[in-house]
UniProtKB/Swiss-Prot annotation:
Name recorded for this polypeptide: Sulfate transporter CysZ
Any Gene Ontology biological process: sulfate assimilation
Record GO cellular component, one term: plasma membrane
Annotated S-S bridges: none
Transmembrane segments: 31-51, 75-95, 151-171, 222-242
Subcellular location: Cell inner membrane
GO molecular function terms attached to this record: high-affinity sulfate:proton symporter activity
Record's keyword terms, sorted: Amino-acid biosynthesis, Cell inner membrane, Cell membrane, Cysteine biosynthesis, Membrane, Sulfate transport, Transmembrane, Transmembrane helix, Transport
Protein's organism: Shigella dysenteriae serotype 1 (strain Sd197)
Role noted for this protein: High affinity, high specificity proton-dependent sulfate transporter, which mediates sulfate uptake. Provides the sulfur source for the cysteine synthesis pathway.
Membrane topology field: Multi-pass membrane protein
Length: 253
């Protein structure tokens, strides 16, 4: 069945909501299972451990608040918690995406075919295994782009005043953009679009992608919901690809 995803591009909020609808389509569910299992096992275990450590980490982070800002501690404490959740959530979602990258690519490919009626390459399980080195190279490209920027932002957390006020906001914006790159890259990579060209394409609709990435980042911090976010975000990003980028960048139709 060909979907009606041929209308004008919508907001990033719309595509995120579509991800929740598309992930449950009958012919798509079987491609959701493996990414979902990876995410449940890794994110579930990681966040369980995180919540056992918060009572140690948050006081440590708050100790960097200078005396002249202590009167704002009742506001800075929630910011400190959100900061830890943002950094921790993005770190482990990155690991989960590395592990599940081949299956996320397959999910994006099959959903795109479902939405457009196009015929994807007949890859199969052996095709996926053969493509793993190229997929992992692509993940390394994303990591190499992300790491130096993340290090600079993490250093800001240790600057008194800035680390408890400005740094959390900057990290949220950065993680929103990086998650948009992470999930939108699956359909782009299925069509062998170079990483640099993909980033350039996303910048042409930066607000849409920031909206999508911001919601993905927020849901990554929410217990239980974050267990399902990976396949949902892949589906939402694929819907965005079909509406916004496919006409210009598609390799197969």
């Amino acid at each position: 069945m060909v979907s009606s995803f041929t209308s004008a591009p919508r907001s990033g909020f719309y595509y995120f909501a579509q991800g929740w609808k598309l992930v449950s389509q009958p012919r798509i569910r079987r491609f959701v299972i493996l990414p979902l299992l990876v995410n449940i096992l890794l994110m579930g275990g990681a966040f369980w451990w995180l919540f056992t450590q918060l009572d140690v980490w948050i006081p440590t982070l708050m100790s960097y608040v200078p005396d002249w800002l202590q009167w704002l501690s009742y506001l800075l404490w929630p910011l400190a918690v959100i900061s830890v959740l943002l950094v921790f959530g993005y770190f482990f979602s990155t690991i989960a995406n590395w592990i599940a990258a081949p299956f996320n690519g397959l999910l994006a490919e099959q959903l795109e075919a479902r939405l457009t009626g196009a015929t994807p390459p007949d890859t199969g399980i052996f095709g996926i295994m053969k493509d793993v080195p190229r997929i992992m190279k692509r993940e390394w490209q994303k990591f190499a782009w992300y790491l130096p920027r993340a290090i600079v932002l993490l250093i800001l957390y240790f600057i008194p005043g800035i680390g408890q006020t400005v740094a959390p906001v900057l990290w949220f914006l950065f993680s929103a953009w990086m998650l948009a790159i992470q999930y939108c890259d699956y359909p782009f990579d299925n069509h062998k679009v170079p990483f640099k060209e993909m980033r350039t394409a996303l910048r042409t609709r930066k607000i849409t992608n920031m909206q999508f990435g911001a919601l993905t980042s927020l849901f990554t911090m929410i217990p239980l919901l974050n267990l399902f976010i990976m396949p949902v975000a892949v589906c939402g990003a694929t819907a965005m690809w079909v509406d916004c980028y496919r006409d210009k960048h598609a390799m197969w139709r």
